[in-house]
Structure formats: C-alpha cells, structure tokens
C-alpha cells in the first residue's frame, strides 16, 4: 500500500514525481501504452507485464494492495472511477505555471516551433473538451502539488513535505473523521454570526450531532429569527438577547444524560463558550476536542480543567495543496 495515480496538465512534471516515488519509496511504475485494445481501451505496462484493459489493471492491483504502485497519467474515466472506490488509492494532481510548462514542451526538438497560442489550445482541449477533462481530475484529487520550479530537488522537497504515504491520507483517523462530521453539521447552521457544528461520541460511535441556530418552531436566524444575530453586535456581546441555541447545546439536549453515559467525547469545530462548558461538565463529558479557537478559550479551559474534562485542540493533517 498504496497506489498513487498522477494526473495533471501537459508538462507539469508527472515523470519527475514517478522518479521520486521509485527512487525514494520503492514504487513500481505503471505506464499507459500508446496503442488501444480492440475495445478502444488503454493498455498498461508495469515492468515486462502488459495489462490489456482497465479490468486487467484493476484485477492486478487489488490483490497487491500491500505493494506500492504509481500510475503515470490517469486517462480513462472508467479507471479513475474504479480506483477512487479503493481504500488504497490516492489521486495526486500535478500542476505548474503555464509558461513553465510551455518552455518544457518546447524542449522536445520536434515541438520547438510550437507557439504559445498553439500550446494553450492543446491544453484547453485536454482540460475542457473531453469526457476525461483535466478540470474534473483536479476537483477529485486528494492532493495538489504545484511544481512551480524547474529544479527537480524543489519538487522532491514538496513531495517529501506532502507525505504521500501518511495513512491518514487514505483512511482518516478518528479525530479527522469526527471533526469532518462536525464541519458537515455546521453547514446546516442557520446562525447569521457563525456556523458551528458538534458531534457527541462514545466508544467511537456517534450519539448525537448538533449545529447552532434558532430553536425548533422559531423562524430561522438567517431569515430574521434572531434580532441580535441579524444586527451588528460584536462577538460575545448581548448574548442574553440571542435566541440561537449553540451546536453543543443542541447535541447535548438531543443525547440527554443517560445516552451520554461515561467516557463520551465532544467534537466541535469551534472551542465551546463558557456557558456551553458548564453544560458539558454537568453531563459528564470526558473530553472536548475543538478545531478553531474562540475568544473565551481561557475561561473555558479553566472551567473544564477544574471539572476534570480534558480540552484538546485538533490539528488537521498538512494542507492538501503544496
């Protein structure tokens, strides 16, 4: 494990990435051959082995998921669709500034007279005018590498920083998983001031979720339901007139003391306020994990510490763009 698929525009540096993975991490390269099979599908090669179709390639990779492979150029929509379902696959989009790519393109003797306009037309056709358009690949990619230098060592340093073999890039940790759920819950928020989401967990099982907004039956905050949030009042001010329930309150109310039980963990994409922290301690939450700081963090930390509740900030994996 894993299989890395490389995609990206012409002359972006995919060959250099293959060289890095082969040299530094012992990957086996898989290349697309220029000819097609009788069904019009691409043919692939790894070492001396020729794989005559997408199905052959998938059948070859699946039982070898413990081995390391890099596919240089994903050109088949069917191949990409099949690989994206596999837990051992990582799609990496390699990009570079267009003038850098143009100058690389012209280094091929037979293409030295290509104009920039001609190169842009070739690039646009590949990016926008096919079922396998590059723009779609960019949207689906797990990682984006900007190869903005002609010095190979600079690209290799970026690849090392990207840590392609990090298991969290293939299957998220519990912290990443539940924080993503909290962020998803936040998208349901109707609060005009900020979106906040929360997930309550025990034994790695979700007990309840919550997001902030006006209570059941009331007009949504983003439809004028809370005058305070629809005004220009500052953060942390006039909270006594706010009609919105906080995400943590919603999750705790949904769960109740009996369902919370012992050793529950509360994940919230924003550090709980002091008022929510009081309720968190009362329900016996063991740990609070948050992502973004809030202006009451020190007060929250003091209260939770006094109550024996662990407070921890979640630091997500390194950015997906390098």
Swiss-Prot record:
Q: Which UniProt keywords apply?
A: Cytoplasm, Hydrolase, Metal-binding, Nucleotide biosynthesis, Nucleus, Zinc
Requisite cofactors: Zn(2+)
Domain CMP/dCMP-type deaminase residue range list: 173-311
Q: Which reaction does it catalyse?
A: dCMP + H2O + H(+) = dUMP + NH4(+)
Keyword hit for Hydrolase: yes
Under the cellular component aspect of Gene Ontology, which terms does the record hold? cytoplasm; cytosol; nucleus
Predominant location category: cytoplasm
Q: Does the keyword Hydrolase apply?
A: yes
**Residues reported in the UniProt entry to bind Zn(2+):** 246, 273, 276
Q: List the disulfide bonds.
A: none
Q: What is its EC number?
A: 3.5.4.12
Q: Which Gene3D superfamilies match?
A: Cytidine Deaminase, domain 2, P-loop containing nucleotide triphosphate hydrolases
Q: Which residues form the active site?
A: 248
Q: Which GO terms describe its biological process?
A: cytidine deamination; dTMP biosynthetic process; dUMP biosynthetic process
Its subcellular locations are:
Cytoplasm; Nucleus
Extract one GO molecular function annotation from the record. dCMP deaminase activity
* InterPro entries with a match to the protein in the record: APOBEC/CMP_deaminase_Zn-bd, CMP_dCMP_dom, Cytidine_deaminase-like, dCMP_deaminase-rel, Deoxycytidylate_deaminase_dom, P-loop_NTPase
What functional role does this protein have? Answer: Supplies the nucleotide substrate for thymidylate synthetase.
Q: Could you say which protein family the record assigns here?
A: Belongs to the cytidine and deoxycytidylate deaminase family.
Q: What is the name attached to this protein's record?
A: Deoxycytidylate deaminase
Q: Which organism is it from?
A: Schizosaccharomyces pombe (strain 972 / ATCC 24843) (Fission yeast)
Q: What is the lineage of its organism?
A: Eukaryota, Fungi, Dikarya, Ascomycota, Taphrinomycotina
């Amino acid at each position: 494990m894993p299989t890395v698929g490389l995609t990206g525009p012409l002359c972006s540096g995919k060959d250099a990435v293959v060289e890095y993975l082969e040299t530094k991490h012992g990957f086996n390269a898989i290349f697309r051959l220029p000819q097609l099979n009788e069904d019009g599908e691409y043919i692939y090669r790894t070492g001396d082995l020729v794989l005559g179709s997408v199905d052959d390639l998938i059948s070859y990779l699946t039982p070898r998921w413990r081995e390391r492979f890099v596919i240089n150029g994903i050109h088949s929509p069917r191949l990409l669709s099949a690989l994206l379902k596999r837990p051992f696959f990582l799609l990496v989009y390699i990009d570079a500034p267009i003038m850098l790519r143009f100058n690389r393109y012209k280094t091929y003797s037979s293409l030295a007279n290509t104009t920039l306009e001609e190169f842009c037309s070739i690039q646009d056709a590949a990016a926008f005018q096919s079922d396998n358009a590059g723009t779609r690949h960019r949207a689906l990619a797990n990682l984006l590498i900007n190869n903005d230098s002609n010095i190979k060592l600079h690209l290799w340093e970026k690849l090392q920083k990207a840590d392609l073999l990090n298991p969290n890039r293939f299957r998220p940790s519990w912290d990443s998983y539940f924080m993503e759920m909290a962020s998803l819950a936040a998208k349901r928020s109707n609060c005009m001031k900020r979106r906040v989401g929360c997930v309550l967990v025990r034994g790695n099982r979700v007990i309840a979720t919550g997001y902030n907004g006006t209570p059941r039956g009331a007009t949504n905050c983003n439809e004028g339901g809370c005058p305070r949030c629809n005004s220009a009042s500052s953060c942390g001010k006039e909270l006594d007139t706010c009609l919105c329930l906080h995400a943590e309150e919603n999750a705790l109310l949904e769960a109740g003391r009996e369902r919370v039980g012992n050793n529950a963990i509360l994940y919230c994409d924003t550090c709980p306020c002091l008022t929510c922290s009081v309720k968190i301690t009362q329900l016996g939450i063991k740990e609070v994990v948050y992502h973004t700081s809030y202006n009451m963090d020190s007060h929250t930390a003091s209260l939770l510490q006094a109550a024996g509740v662990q407070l921890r900030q979640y630091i997500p994996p390194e950015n997906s763009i390098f």
